[in-house]
Amino acid sequence: AVVAKPKTVRRAKPVFRPGGFIYELNVRGFTMRHPDVPEKLRGTVAALAHPAIIEHLQRLGVSEVELMPVTAWIDERHLPPLGLANGWGYNPVTFMALDPRLAPGGLADLRHAVAALHGAGIGVILDLVFNHTGESDALGTSLSLRGLDSRAYYRHAADGQLINDTGTGNTV
């Protein structure tokens, strides 16, 4: 293992404004077709730092953006056979790693976007999913927590079946 001291990053303190306007957005959906955002940035976290996106949010009077999940997720297993995909991010396979489809540049992309938004006076709220995973029910794929130790991470009934309080097949 290689251990490296992370770079010190100066972070702007968020400014709380009572009565603000929180705009919830799906990163991919919000930035994918904006004509002023360079094509290579569209659909990514990095696009949120583009002046056209920031100007649009400012024109709307947005005080904070709430980013729908940006951590790695998987499609529900019934979607691919139908030619469909999940773009919402609510089926996480990990809790803290960014989805490479949204942040191909990794954490640097998110840091840059947050710094640009903060610099424009716009706060950032991350929507995180901690109550279930995309591993689904007993028939789902073992990708992370289930493969490590299903009983330690997921709630199980006395008979060993996964408890499904979330409607997704499992409850953490």
Give the ranges of each region predicted by the language model:
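The feature marks proteins involved in alpha-glucan
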Residues: 1-26, 31-43
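Substrate-binding/active-site clefts of carbohydrate-active enzymes
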Residues: 28-172
